[in-house]
Amino acid sequence: MPMIPPALRRTQAAATPTTSSPAASSSTTATLDSQSLCALPRIRVSASTLNSIVTPVKKITSETDVEAWKASAAYSIYTLFLQRVCEACVGKPTRLPTRSTDAPVTPVDKLVSLLWELDSWTQEIEPHEKPQRFGNLAFRDWGARLEERIDSLLSDLLPSRLHAFAVELRVYLLDSFGSFTRIDYGSGHELAFFAWLCFLYRLGFFDASEEQEQDETLADIQVEERIGLDIFPLYLMVVWKLQDRYGLEPAGSHGVWGLDDFQFLPYVIGAAQLRRQSGLRPNQVIGASSHASILQTQLATRTDPASLISTTLVLPASSLVGTQVEVPLPNLYLSSLLRIHVLKRGPFHEHSPLLNDIASSVPNWLKVYFGMLKMYAAECLAKKVVVQHFAFGGVGWVWTHQAHSELPRLATPSAPVAARRHLPLGGIQGNMTSMGVPTPRITRPPATPDSFDHPLRLPPRSTPSRPSTTPSVPPLAASTRPAPKPE
């Protein structure tokens, strides 16, 4: 079983900023550049690894299993991968790749070609004309084609040295586009696709050569950037079209009190894209996305998913502080808001109160980003209704019943900073609580600005003590650069 090596937990270079972390600042101009994180553990292709391949099956059936999942190496690897992709996207615009008629050359090109092939099926498979109450049954025809052709798709995608891993990889790809039985889609399917990408990454699929590096390289960062800014937006376009074409139901949606009916990760990655600038602030993004110059002029005839993701918009001057040059456009956060405006009618604060509260209450994108990470961990990765469908195999995502004692945990407020640097998504025991999202089933206080405080915020000391000289740090694995000062 692949284990987390010491490199995952070791500080690569201790950054010692002289000022307090911008994450703890209430300034509207607080920003943070991209940070270096420790490398993901790779999967070595060896005889023992090949012998460990098994068909993934579901393992999470109880809340006890959810706790075991949160304490597992698989959880830590997934959350680190998500953070690495986010860091690679900081300050950069979305780039939706176009469909090429040329033969794909690089691994990324092959993956892009696969997604465009899947998108073409959506146009080919017509919805059933007979009125249907819960989604269109033609989506099952789409799913049947995927199940029929997935082995050939993976055979064309993977190099020969990785063909044996198709047994495990196919399960995650099949689960990435929705439930063909229930005709629905939700954040669990989004999780499956991102887990599939992480599996490919760890196998060395994206590597230029078969030599797999253990340390972070420029090539790794470039691959993560393409995953976040090219591949994931293209996947988002594919599933948005599926939702529209076949009327997919939201899977496990909180309704009006949820962040989004279908997606979550676009808000996490989108907040990372906006984290380095303060020209477009959270309290202005709702107004910008609903401005008449955008919805009625720039996007008047282009409200399809591809246009919402790829169009470089000219933001209204009233929504900006300073110039527009520093705002990365397009970005996934704004694209997701535009998608909501296209699909829903009425005042934004009524049909999307949580997004509205975040925009009006959180002072800067740095806090939005860390809050989204914390909320994703609490509302998706820690919810049985979401992760119960996640499958575990023998190589890529491995199930264990016991917690990994080697994973660092923050036990007391006096724990050293170095012990807190590698906790994915602020993974402190007892700190992965809900963001305060009320639902019909569970009554909780409404979300407040404090909900988006730093995920590693410590409780107040019960007795007076000498002020610490160690600054707080964001919940990133390891930083080689100090966090910049607020503007």
Curated annotation (Swiss-Prot):
Keywords: Cytoplasm, Isomerase, Nucleus, Rotamase. It catalyses: [protein]-peptidylproline (omega=180) = [protein]-peptidylproline (omega=0). It is an enzyme of class 5 (isomerase). InterPro entries: Phstyr_phstse_ac (IPR004327), PTPA_C_lid (IPR043170), PTPA_sf (IPR037218). Residues 1-28, 426-487 are annotated as: Disordered. It is found in: Cytoplasm; Nucleus. GO terms for cellular component: cytoplasm; nucleus; protein phosphatase type 2A complex. The keyword Nucleus applies. GO terms for molecular function: peptidyl-prolyl cis-trans isomerase activity; protein tyrosine phosphatase activator activity. The keyword Transmembrane does not apply. Signal peptide: none annotated. Its EC number is 5.2.1.8. GO terms for biological process: mitotic spindle organization. Belongs to the PTPA-type PPIase family. PPIases accelerate the folding of proteins. It catalyzes the cis-trans isomerization of proline imidic peptide bonds in oligopeptides. Acts as a regulatory subunit for PP2A-like phosphatases modulating their activity or substrate specificity, probably by inducing a conformational change in the catalytic subunit, a direct target of the PPIase. Can reactivate inactive phosphatase PP2A-phosphatase methylesterase complexes (PP2Ai) in presence of ATP and Mg(2+) by dissociating the inactive form from the complex. This is Serine/threonine-protein phosphatase 2A activator 1. It comes from Mycosarcoma maydis (Corn smut fungus).
